[in-house]
Amino acid sequence: MYKVLLVLASAAALKRPERALKVRGGELGLNAETAIQVGTWVTGLSGAMAYVDPKGNLENYGITTAQASGIDNMRWAGANQLTLAAIFAADPEQAVGLSGYYAAWNLIASAPATLATGFPKAAIYGWAAVCAVLGKKTLSGDVSPWALVAVWGLNGIQQHFMQDQCVEMYGAKKPTALGKSMMGIAGQTMILAAVYMGALVKGKSQAEAFAYSWIAGALFGAKWAFTEADNFNAPKAGPLAWTVIGAGIAYACLKE
């Protein structure tokens, strides 16, 4: 999977050389507009592969032994990546409000996986309703956009750093080590969404917000490579590929 992402990222960058590449001081480089397009497509593709074939996606990263908990939470992580790609693709002025609707879709679309891990229907569909209402109220200006940023960020922090407490709070099944790790990846994706939208709310440009999100993503990739990959006999190359891609995209967005 990570090899495919690297190839696609390179191909996308070269697809429209007259717009994607420019010379500055003799240096040929990727511009911010194309970096955003590349990053959005890479995120969406990765999410689609994880959602449609979570077991196969794990195998692409060298994880060949996966129980139901790991597979279900890989699908949940994939749904979150697809949602993050949709937020990236949205008009920056409406991205935060739309993220409420996207979150509702995410929760409903991934319900078969999250229900299988023991999360109750009331929590899943209740959160979907809350997010949809917040999305509507944010777009109409009746609610501060920081409310949705907080929902994304706090839920992401809980799922990435406090999986045991999250499972206990909702009365879900205790996950396997891989299931817990994949829940962490789902959580980190929520954090990336919160970083992006928080930067937009603070008045940063889309390129700056995109860069900050990908810097965070690069750090999470390195974190997983050096703290979790060995637990599953997974090569470090996969998560570190995300670190390399993230660093490159962030550089392209911030250098102008």
Segments predicted by a language model, with ranges:
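N-terminal chloroplast transit peptides
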Residues: 1-22
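Core segments of alpha-helical transmembrane spans in multipass integral membrane proteins
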Residues: 41-50, 68-93, 98-107, 154-155, ...
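Membrane-helix boundary connector in multi-pass membrane proteins
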Residues: 107-122, 220-237
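Cytosolic juxtamembrane helix and N-cap/initiation of the first transmembrane helix
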Residues: 25-43, 68, 137-152
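Hydrophobic cores of alpha-helical transmembrane segments in multi-pass inner/ER membrane proteins
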Residues: 80-86, 126-135, 190-195, 243-249
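Transmembrane alpha-helix/helix-exit interface in multi-pass inner-membrane proteins
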Residues: 44-59, 149-169
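Interfacial loop at the N-terminal end of multi-pass membrane proteins
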Residues: 55-74, 164-183
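Membrane-water interface at the C-terminal end of transmembrane alpha helices
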Residues: 49-50, 130-142, 245-256
